[in-house]
């Protein structure tokens, strides 16, 4: 009887699954554990890559602003500290490898981590070395012909009323306003890119295809190197530059402290210093000049910056003025230049009629400027740099500046490039 019981037990198969499950349980637990460790390694990979991206961008932003790339990248790595690093970070400016190798405007960061995890250690799986590598660079964001140097939260560039602005280039402002460029009313704006240190709001006033670049890095003053007027420039500054209605007058370069143009004025080649007065051009006046630069300043600018000259060119005036083209001239490409010591208390107005021809840069670093073009006005090469810039009326600026002495304004942005 005992023998029959043993035989039945040997023939019984109902416990096989349980036995097989018990035998395979270590493998199942190990596989699940290894999967858990793999998820952790994947998370670390994402975190270390994010840390490398952030550090490279911090380094590139430092380069853009003239600071030390390595210091900024190192500080950013310490700040984020998403992953415990097992090797000293590699920070290169310029990179030694990749498409930006040797580029001093680029920063490459390589980070490394490695750590054993419980399940993989039990299974004898060696912990992988996880890398994060990123390269960020300061690159050009486009060519600009309108630059606003405003640094506060005030709107930098305004396009209003029925202004039709076709610039054939970009516009950029250092304004930190939430909408740093205002395109309102029935204005139509064809300018790309549109960049700002602050925010930018999409608008139907922008032409189709316009690229908006909010939160860009500040643009440098493209004319920061122009010399500031000195006492020597004001020698014999007791002259009047004027023409009555219906008469024609010609003038030589020099210093003038009284300007009132109602007739026709011809300016000879050279630099004209306008001392502590308003450069007024009447509605029916005509002013002609080639290779000229008009500097709005004051002989007492150091003690009384509010005395610095301004400009007011009325609509209807015929303005035929071209800046110097000789690159040996320190003012090459500059048509109007207001002393940068001017207080932010005035607006400079430049208008013109359909017969006007303007070529050169308008530079008003300390004050606002307003430009109102007219249909048919020739402005093939005009650049504008002001603390704030306002467009009213029609402005069709093609900006074909070859051989004119007017340099391009190229702004930059920081982005990941590898």
What are these regions (language model features)?
Residues 39-46, 50, 54-117, 136, ...:
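Short amphipathic secondary-structure patches
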Residues 232-243, 402-418:
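Short, low-complexity, Pro/Ser/Thr/Gly-rich segments in the mature regions of secreted, periplasmic
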Residues 161-165, 185-189, 200-212, 243-247, ...:
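Small-residue (G/S/T/A) turn/hinge positions that recur once per unit in extracellular repeat modules
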Residues 214-237, 284, 291-299, 312-341, ...:
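Acidic/polar low-complexity surface segments
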Residues 117-231, 343-385, 389-394:
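Short, ordered "entry" segments at domain starts
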Residues 153-160, 173, 179-183, 253-258, ...:
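Beta-strand-rich extracellular passenger or scaffold domains
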Residues 1-75, 173, 177, 274:
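Alpha-helical assembly-interface signal, strongest on the long, hydrophobic N-terminal helix that forms
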Residues 16-18, 26, 30-33, 38-42, ...:
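Extended compositionally biased segments used for macromolecular assembly or nucleic-acid engagement
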């Amino acid at each position: 009887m005992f023998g029959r019981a043993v035989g039945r037990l040997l023939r019984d198969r109902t416990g096989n699954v349980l036995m097989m499950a018990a035998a395979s349980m270590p493998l199942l637990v190990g596989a699940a554990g290894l999967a858990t460790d793999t998820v952790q390694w994947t998370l670390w990979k994402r975190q270390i890559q994010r840390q490398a991206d952030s550090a490279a961008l911090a380094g590139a932003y430092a380069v853009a602003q003239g600071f030390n790339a390595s210091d900024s990248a190192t500080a950013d790595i310490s700040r984020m500290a998403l992953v415990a690093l097992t090797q000293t970070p590699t920070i290169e400016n310029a990179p030694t490898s990749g498409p930006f190798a040797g580029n001093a405007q680029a920063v490459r960061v390589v980070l490394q981590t490695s750590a054993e995890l419980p399940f993989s250690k039990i299974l004898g799986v060696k912990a992988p070395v996880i890398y994060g590598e990123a390269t960020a660079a300061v690159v050009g964001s486009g060519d600009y012909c309108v630059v606003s140097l405003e640094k506060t939260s005030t709107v930098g560039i305004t396009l209003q009323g029925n202004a039709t602005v076709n610039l054939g280039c970009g516009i950029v402002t250092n304004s930190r306003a939430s909408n740093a460029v205002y395109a309102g009313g029935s204005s139509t704006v064809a300018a790309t890119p549109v960049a700002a240190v602050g925010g930018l709001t999409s608008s139907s006033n922008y032409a189709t295809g316009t690229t908006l670049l909010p939160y860009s890095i500040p643009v440098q003053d493209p004319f920061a190197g122009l010399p500031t007027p000195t006492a020597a420039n004001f020698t014999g500054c007791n002259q009047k530059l004027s023409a009555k209605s219906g008469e024609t007058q010609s003038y030589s370069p020099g210093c003038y402290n009284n300007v009132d143009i109602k007739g026709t004025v011809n300016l000879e080649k050279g630099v004209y210093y306008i001392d502590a007065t308003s450069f007024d051009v009447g509605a029916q006046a005509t002013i002609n000049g080639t290779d000229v630069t008009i500097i709005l300043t004051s002989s007492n600018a150091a003690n009384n910056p509010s005395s610095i000259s301004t400009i007011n060119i009325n609509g209807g005036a015929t303005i035929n003025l071209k800046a110097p083209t000789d690159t040996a001239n320190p003012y090459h490409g500059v048509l109007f230049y207001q002393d940068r010591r001017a207080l932010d208390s005035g607006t400079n107005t430049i208008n013109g009629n359909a017969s006007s021809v303007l070529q050169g840069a308008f530079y008003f670093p300390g004050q606002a400027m307003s430009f109102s073009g007219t249909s048919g006005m020739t402005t093939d090469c005009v650049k504008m740099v002001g603390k704030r810039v306002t467009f009213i009326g029609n402005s069709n600026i093609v900006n074909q500046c070859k051989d004119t002495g007017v340099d391009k304004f190229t702004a930059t942005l920081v982005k990941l490039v590898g």
